[in-house]
Amino acid sequence: MAGGRDRGDLAARQLVFLLPEHLKDASKKKKKSSLLFVKLANPHSGEGATYLIDMCLQQLFEIKVFKEKHHSWFINQSVQSGGLLHFATPMDPLFLLLHYLLKAGKEGKYQPLDQVVVDDTFPDCTLLLRFPELEKSLRHVTEEKEVNSKKYYKYSSEKTLKWLEKKVNQTVVALKANNVNVGARVQSSAYFSGGQVSRDKEEDYVRYAHGLISDYIPKELSDDLSKFLKLPEPPASLTNPPSKKLKLSDEPVEAKEDYTKFNTKDLKTGKKNSKMTAAQKALAKVDKSGMKSIDAFFGAKNKKTGKI
């Protein structure tokens, strides 16, 4: 666990992070922190999100925040309100590069990478080009040409879908290895009724893994991946959860059964035929003369009349 400071807060707000051990060890060896927090475009939404880059090990981490109500941290001699817990988890930088490759791919031409990964809103995106083995990774999602010792790239939809399929399969293996039960989660996210949930367990894993990968790619690409994986679409009638509101109508409602056949006479007959318990038999033998009926205690009182 490590603590950090939010430079944007004049009160030096401290943040609590859970980091992999090797990140702290690398910083100690360098005697200087090599961790850099940057704001980059989220590959799913395109909006800004905070990421962590280890400049020493050349690794990218996404930041997940766990928030709980009425929670605070005791840090040394101070109390930090809010109680946010930040997690740094490794992330494939190719997902962030894919955001820019998709944009450039609309032009349908080969371009050098330094002209593709450009963003005035998030200028730190150029740090992604420093990651080792970048060229090998780009082969999974682009077509490549070399002219005068300079390489040019063009987005490839076919290659990208095959690469994402591998990511889905790797996720399925990880889910099974960790004994993650995905059946109920798939039913909830897809609004399937109990009788319509896929009986094929493998399909449930693939559908759930597809949902996880979709958090790192645009909606349009997620839909293309779903078709590529041949995942069946949920029925149109179940696209949205069923409404619980009653349907109102001006027409009179007719009973489907004749409830008048269950009259008082039948009920009394039924009581006579039913067997009495020992306590009921003993109560029946008690002399009830002079006793008031229970109705006398709850009925309307009669007004007394007399001469004045």
From Swiss-Prot:
Pfam families: RNase_H2-Ydr279, Ydr279_N. Keywords: Acetylation, Nucleus, Phosphoprotein. Its main location: nucleus. GO terms for cellular component: nucleoplasm; ribonuclease H2 complex. The modification N-acetylalanine is found at A2. The modification N6-acetyllysine is found at K292. It is found in: Nucleus. One of its GO terms (biological process) is mismatch repair. The keyword Membrane does not apply. Gene3D superfamilies: 1.10.20.120, 2.20.25.530. InterPro entries: RNase_H2_suB, RNase_H2_suB_wHTH, Rnh202_N. The keyword Transmembrane helix does not apply. The modification Phosphoserine is found at S293. Non catalytic subunit of RNase H2, an endonuclease that specifically degrades the RNA of RNA:DNA hybrids. Participates in DNA replication, possibly by mediating the removal of lagging-strand Okazaki fragment RNA primers during DNA replication. Mediates the excision of single ribonucleotides from DNA:RNA duplexes. Belongs to the RNase H2 subunit B family. The RNase H2 complex is a heterotrimer composed of the catalytic subunit RNASEH2A and the non-catalytic subunits RNASEH2B and RNASEH2C. This is Ribonuclease H2 subunit B. The lineage of its organism: Eukaryota, Metazoa, Chordata, Craniata, Vertebrata. The gene is Rnaseh2b.
